[in-house]
């Protein structure tokens, strides 16, 4: 009579084949695949960001001047909310680990509680990223872009603080036409018009003697170079368009690469 013998080797395999690779279970192996792929992906992002920042360090936007907002509060809070988001992300990771540990110890109520905290933390983080994107895209002060793609920002010479376009731009009786299929090239689309035209910014600048231009270049003190009144007027002669906020092509904060990395890294992180 034939008989079937079950060996310990057969019990140690998963999905056919020989013994478990490195003695790991299927779930643990897939978790390591996830961790390593994550590490490689973010390493690539951060290495590219670091290289680009080092390459253009003299004109790279200052993060403390870009991320200054906190929901429901008005004022200048450099990187405060970014630090809060980092704290929420770390704590949600901790609660997830605690939930897994509670599951191993068969503590159902603890698992439910820690998973609830993890979900709340994840919702806060993703919601914060959505708010951060909206604020970044909308912009704060506005700027003008030159023929060479450089960004010129504006400063109040009396106080040294940034000046928004709305603070000095003139209102001119000029007609502004947005490109549409019926009045242009049918396969070319155009975004919404900025609040002010280049001419309105120039005329307003001439009428306010206390407004000067701040360039992208960073001096030895780590601050953006502020031009004199005459130098500002000379620079503005090369202005081609008004930039409000940021996207993948134009960026009022400075280098467009800064905005590109912001969208790709934070976007991948949010979906991840």
Predicted regions located by residue number:
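...captures the hydrophobic TM-helix bundle architecture rather than a specific catalytic motif
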Residues: 1-272
């Amino acid at each position: 009579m034939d008989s079937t013998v079950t060996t310990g080797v057969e019990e140690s395999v998963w999905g056919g084949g020989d013994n478990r690779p490195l003695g790991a279970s299927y779930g643990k192996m897939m978790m390591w695949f996830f961790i390593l792929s994550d590490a490689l992906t973010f390493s690539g992002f951060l290495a590219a960001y670091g290289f680009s920042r080092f390459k253009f360090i003299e004109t790279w936007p200052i993060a403390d001047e870009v991320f200054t907002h906190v929901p429901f509060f008005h004022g200048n809070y450099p990187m405060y909310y970014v630090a809060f988001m980092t704290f929420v992300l770390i704590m949600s990771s901790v609660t997830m680990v605690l939930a897994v540990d509670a599951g191993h110890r068969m503590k159902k109520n603890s698992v439910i509680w820690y998973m609830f905290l993890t979900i709340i933390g994840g919702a806060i983080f993703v919601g914060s990223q959505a708010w951060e994107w909206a604020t970044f895209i909308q912009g704060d002060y506005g700027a003008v872009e030159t023929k060479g793609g450089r960004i010129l920002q504006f400063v109040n010479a009396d106080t040294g603080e940034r000046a928004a376009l709305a603070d000095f731009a003139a209102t001119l009786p000029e007609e502004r036409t947005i490109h549409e299929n019926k009045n242009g090239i049918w396969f070319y689309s155009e975004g919404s018009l900025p609040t002010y035209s280049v001419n309105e910014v120039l005329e307003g600048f001439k009428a306010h003697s206390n407004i000067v231009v701040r360039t992208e270049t960073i001096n030895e003190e780590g601050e953006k170079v502020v031009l004199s009144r005459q130098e500002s007027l000379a620079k503005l002669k090369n202005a081609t368009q008004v930039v409000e906020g940021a996207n993948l092509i134009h960026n009022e904060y400075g280098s467009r690469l800064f905005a590109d990395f912001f969208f790709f890294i934070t976007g991948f992180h949010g979906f991840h």
